[in-house]
Amino acid sequence: MSSGGLLLLLGLLTLCAELTPVSSRKRHPDCDKPPDTKICQTVVRAFYYKPSAKRCVQFRYGGCNGNGNHFKSDHLCRCECLEYS
């Protein structure tokens, strides 16, 4: 990916939290699902939202496409799963 593409991605990620009104943000339903730790392909570091801890936690994702509660970064996890209401 070019440096311009990376800057655009960073800008979009930053806007994720900034443009959504705090009072209307709801956690995505997939964020309540447990992490899928089955191994199907290469194991990579990922993050999932842990509702009991109210935070994102690192885990080993095996590439099985399990559910929507797996993210490439802690930032993306927090952006999608933290609830502001």
From Swiss-Prot:
Expression tissues: Expressed by the venom gland.
Signal peptide range in chain numbering: 1-24
Record's keyword annotation contains rRNA-binding: no
SUPFAM superfamilies for the chain: BPTI-like
Intrachain disulfide bonds: C31-C81, C40-C64, C56-C77
Domain BPTI/Kunitz inhibitor: 31-81
UniProtKB keywords: Disulfide bond, Ion channel impairing toxin, Neurotoxin, Potassium channel impairing toxin, Presynaptic neurotoxin, Secreted, Signal, Toxin, Voltage-gated potassium channel impairing toxin
Gene3D superfamilies: Pancreatic trypsin inhibitor Kunitz domain
An MF annotation (GO) of this entry: potassium channel regulator activity
Subcellular location: Secreted
Gene Ontology cellular-component annotations: extracellular space
Presence of keyword Disulfide bond: yes
Purpose of the protein: Beta-bungarotoxins are presynaptic neurotoxins of the venom. The B chain is homologous to venom basic protease inhibitors but has no protease inhibitor activity and blocks voltage-gated potassium channels (Kv).
UniProt similarity note: Belongs to the venom Kunitz-type family.
Complex and partners: Heterodimer; disulfide-linked. The A chains have phospholipase A2 activity and the B chains show homology with the basic protease inhibitors.
Name of the protein in question: Kunitz-type serine protease inhibitor homolog beta-bungarotoxin B4 chain
Species whose genome carries this gene: Bungarus multicinctus
Lineage: Eukaryota, Metazoa, Chordata, Craniata, Vertebrata
